[in-house]
Amino acid sequence: MSNTEFHPHIGVGLRLPHHDHFHHHRPALSWLEIHSENYFQPNSFHRQQLNQMAEHYQISCHGIGLSLGSVAGVNPQHLLRLKQLVDDLQPFLVSDHLSWSENGGHYFNDLLPLPYTEEALEVFCRNVLHVQDALKRPILIENPSSYLKYQHSTISEWQFLTEVQRRTDCRLLLDLNNVYVSAFNHGFDCQTYLEAIPAACVDEIHLAGFTIKSLEQGEIWIDTHSQPVSAEVWQLYQQWIAQHGSRHTLIEWDLDLPPVDVLLNEAKKADTLLRASLLHTNPMHPSLALG
């Protein structure tokens, strides 16, 4: 298999259990995305493997620990380790989330939502600018999945994210599964969100699966990254690229990891839709399953 089988914009998330397969078999993709924090130790076995894989794949560094929404600012040690990783790997993309996860040196095992207020906006933008100055490059900010919202928020999430981009010149990572999940949980329309986001600033798209959890009050949709991409999210992707064109597109799968072939099959679905969009054709009716 050559690394031209997939469209160059199609990639998958590289997770530690799949390391050996990608290292030895080199599936025919152009790029892989890592969780930055898993590779902060420069002499670790997995870091050495990654260095070798980086000779064959472009690498994107996707962070989960910068906690850009923290009032106290970005942890300097965390930023230093990220900078060392970025300087060594020279990834073509670096990203993190519209969220916070650290307070007073204590890290939470989740990406927590922000209140969408002017005060939070100033904090978030200050931290983004600090990181971009340290890394000497723009970073991508990903829209979150969310399960609660603050009563004192004064603007919508999409307005907040758009303003972050305007004030910091960062780029955007559009997670379509997060949009779909949050739209159900909070009762907004996906199209309202997607039409408000400045498409020209979107450099990457994430596609993943979600889980439905039943509660006494009703259902909640959770962005678990443990399922195939849903038909509805595929349809959002098809519509978005038809309107705005090709972007680097990632298949995310973090929990209940399937065999690599299953992951690559999801990537092939994205590849099919992307190539069809570039040819201005529609390979399938939205009602048809992609499985």
UniProtKB/Swiss-Prot annotation:
- InterPro entries named among the record's database cross-references: MbnB/TglH/ChrH, Xyl_isomerase-like_sf
User: Record's superkingdom?
Assistant: Bacteria
Similarity comment: family membership:
Belongs to the UPF0276 family.
The identity of this protein, by name, is: UPF0276 protein VV1_0952
* Species of the source: Vibrio vulnificus (strain CMCP6)
